[in-house]
Amino acid sequence: SFGLLMLTLLAFSFFSCSDKVDESNIYVFNGKSIADYIKEDPDLSYYYFMLQHAKSGKKGSTMDHLLEARGNYTVFVPTNNAVQHYLDSIFSTPNYDINQTPDSVAQDIVFNSIIDSEHNEAYKTTSFQEGTIDYKTMADRFATVTFGTNDTTGKVRIFIDAFSEITSADNEAENGWMHVVNRVVMPYSSTLPDLIAGQDNLLIFSHLLFTTNWKDSLQAIRDE
């Protein structure tokens, strides 16, 4: 009948339209996201803790959810030792309890470690050039790349913001590239005491700076 024919045509039209659904924004991966790789690696668990306590600014969501989503992210992930070293330095406390980390510090660590290339490719190390990376970090700063050479092996060494050496490069995920670093990434504009705190051979000096007023004096000199 005419009515049955119309129902058939409407049904066909509905399913035809359903086939045209844009899947570009559906958060489904065939492989793993950057967040998955970080979560599964015990040596990156401190950074994952930071992700869970850093707000993405989207309705209170945290950064671990951002790195589960589609995108083109370059992430410089510090090891547990790197995170512990940084916390010990800025709080002048050996073996600082990571659970006591203020959310603001977690956000600072995380935002300085992530570059969102939006619709462009995330960065492999083969695309790095000496100098400033084109896209800003989520902390709204330009990270820098410098190259060095291992004196023993002759292998190229890559440093982010001068002090954070990439120790495991080009770990590919569905939503970008992950590079493991041996220091928390902090920009050049960090205070001089904070930069000193990042160096193993200056730990005693760093402790003295943070336990005396010399830290403030150095900051005042830098600000002038």
Task: Walk through the language-model features, giving the residues of each.
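Mature, structured domains of secreted/extracytosolic soluble proteins
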Residues: 15-224
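Sec-dependent bacterial lipoprotein signal peptides
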Residues: 1-17
